Amino acid sequence: MTKHLLVTNDFPPKIGGIQSYLWELWRRLPPEDVTVLTTPHVDADLFDRDQGFRIERTREPVLLPTPVLARRVRHLAAEVGAEAVVLDPAVPLGLIGAGLRLPYAVLLHGSEVTIPGRLPGTRSLLARVLAQASLLIAAGGYPEAEARRVTDALPPIVQIPPGVDTARFTPLAPIERASTRARLGLPATGPLVLSISRLVPRKGMDTLIEAGARLSTSGRHPQLTVAIAGQGRDRARLDRLINKTGAPARLLGRIPSPDLPALYACADVFALSCRSRWGGLEQEGFGIVFLEAAAAGIPSVAGDSGGSAEAVIDGETGLVLKDPSDPTALAEAIGQLLSDPARASRQGQAARHRAETDFSYDVLAHHLGNAIERLGVPATS
């Protein structure tokens, strides 16, 4: 494969969807062909020693598209014999691409394309980065579509969506669910609706709390528990909303990574009513959490925002809400699955099958490696 550098601000041990996406893909590439340039982080030394590939960390806490960074990338590329560079994301780091004197690719996620692509002051910068790149790596159809809104002068595009570790996230046998819930501090019986995300407005946790209140007072699901895992600036507001509505919701805070597979697998439904905000500037990039729920055999209810409808197939692996801000519609969708266990089971099994066949990181990394290999092939006239 083409020897290359990955240059990014977002790499483990930092926690987040993009960080996980990059690590899961790049750790599956031939280690002798990979060097990562990224930022410092607590416990980075321990993490870096466990990787099969080289990781270089800057002293600066944030990588910015400066001449200093461009020189650092050129020198490191020469040192390791890299033939190409992958820049993440397109803006701002993609701005150094044209000056590297090497073929370069840029990664396209969600808001990292949408926001600069729709603001007059940055649209032309993004268009230039995209047009001058040798390859675009899009994390799904949504960021590719956003790139095509910016300019028609695009290089080849390959879609490499987020994946999931289907060996780590697996279904639980029914006999294990009660004991697993008890171990995690959750009610052993009764319907369990799970959501995992940063607690920020566009994730729609307020809508989920209001939907939970409607479901519990309807008389159909009196033992319902809505478990919300994650941290974020919306925590205090959500606490107040739970108290106001009397919703059977619990804010679990940050869940240790080793406990996540079991938490998904002991739920009945996964729900994330993500929504678009600010005229479409804020949207869901893809939603790795939907894939983790799918691998655990759990159907999802998703808000139709950005790439979420790619992660959940409406009516097959879960339900997609056209109006994610409507708590009545969300309550109805969740209620459909809770009231029809056979349907929920079918959709959960279909979700698991799709996770194994379409979102295996081994398969996705193979496609990524083939795309990067083409970066090192000189263009023919």
Task: Briefly describe each language-model feature range.
Residues L87-L93:
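Short His-centered aromatic/hydrophobic patch
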Residues S179-A182, Q336, R343-D358, L364:
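A short, well-ordered alpha-helix in the C-terminal region of glycosyltransferases
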Residues R254, A265-Q283, I298:
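Acidic donor-binding loop of glycosyltransferase active sites
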Residues P40, Y142, G163:
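Carbohydrate-associated surface elements
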Residues G219, A236-P261, V269:
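Nucleotide-activated donor-binding/catalytic signature segment of Leloir-type glycosyltransferases, i.e.
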Residues P187-K203, I209-A213:
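Conserved donor-binding/catalytic core segment of Leloir-type glycosyltransferases
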Residues T170-L186:
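A short helix/loop element that forms part of the nucleotide-sugar donor recognition site in Leloir-type
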